[in-house]
């Protein structure tokens, strides 16, 4: 079984990836937050910085592309090839309204025939290995049957299935029955993505779907960066589900690497604080209690106040036990 880090817009950029890769059990692949090539055949400076090889040393990175124009996709794959990337991922899963309103991400799933033409064009013109990250459809999981018919016509590197429809966003439980039908009918390797927050969650997916080749971890890793180690059994102590002081120290080092990384590239305290507060919306779940410190982190307007709140949280609060 292989493990991938999901692309989480605004969070899992190269600062986060480097810190995670250096401190915790490495992923087999890391997927970048989406790149959105525009009609002028260019990428934003921020997007380009995120995928530059020198900013991702030793990291097996797969750039993700968001577009519904085959010409832009092919251009982007050639640009990425110049940077050394052989595999790219097509985003057909983003549920954001600003994305889907333009018929991109999960919004592209509303136009199966247009998607079919798009795939025909990119597979006939691009030299890249192409994987797809998809949802089940827009409103009804039954839409996935037609989508699978389309996907099966093309030589996908891999199909990453998030078994929710666009209208679910991240609510409701993943539709495992629909995922099962997709996994059985797929002509390429299948990766599961969705609601793996604990070791038990992973075991249930692995047991039910022994044919899948990989699992993609997203919010579960953001909430508990040691999740992959727990799944692999690399940080469990016999007879105890408690956390060790070494684990807490590693989590602090992880935080500090991200913090100093953002200070280095962001302009001004406000922007650094915004990025760190976004991280804490997930990372705060790793701690027992400490609500008053978490509130201080959220309300901090100066880096000094932020540092004091984080220091107190790590000093006085324990990590939630393994489950």
What label would you give each PLM region?
Residues 1-323:
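Flavin-dependent oxidoreductase catalytic cores
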């Amino acid at each position: 079984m292989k493990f991938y880090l999901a692309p989480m817009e605004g969070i899992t950029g190269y600062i986060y990836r480097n810190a995670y890769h250096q401190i915790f059990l490495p992923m087999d692949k890391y997927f970048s937050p989406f790149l959105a090539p525009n009609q002028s055949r260019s990428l934003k400076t921020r997007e380009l910085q995120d995928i530059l090889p020198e900013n991702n040393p030793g990291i097996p990175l797969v750039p993700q592309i968001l577009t519904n124009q085959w010409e832009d996709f092919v251009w982007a794959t050639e640009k990425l090839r110049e940077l050394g990337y052989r595999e790219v991922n097509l985003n057909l899963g983003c549920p954001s309204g600003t994305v889907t309103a333009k018929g991109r991400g999960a919004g592209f799933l509303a136009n199966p025939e247009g998607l079919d033409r798009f795939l025909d064009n990119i597979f006939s013109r691009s030299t890249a290995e192409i994987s797809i990250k998809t949802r089940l459809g827009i409103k009804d999981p039954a839409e996935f049957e037609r989508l699978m018919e389309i996907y099966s016509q093309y030589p996908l590197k891999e199909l990453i299935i998030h078994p929710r429809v666009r209208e679910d966003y991240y609510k409701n439980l993943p539709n495992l029955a629909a995922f099962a039908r997709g996994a059985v009918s797929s002509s390429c390797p299948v990766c599961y993505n969705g609601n793996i927050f604990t070791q038990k969650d992973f075991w249930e997916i692995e047991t039910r779907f022994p044919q899948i080749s990989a699992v993609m971890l997203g919010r579960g890793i953001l909430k508990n960066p040691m999740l992959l180690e727990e799944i692999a059994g690399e940080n469990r102590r016999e007879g105890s589900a408690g956390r060790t002081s070494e684990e807490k120290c590693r989590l602090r080092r992880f935080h500090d690497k991200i913090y100093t990384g953002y200070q280095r590239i962001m302009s001004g305290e406000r922007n650094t604080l915004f990025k760190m507060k976004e991280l804490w919306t997930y990372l705060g779940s790793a701690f027992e209690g400490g609500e008053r410190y978490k509130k201080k982190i959220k309300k901090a307007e100066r880096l000094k106040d932020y540092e004091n709140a984080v220091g107190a949280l790590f000093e006085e609060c324990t990590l939630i036990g393994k489950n």
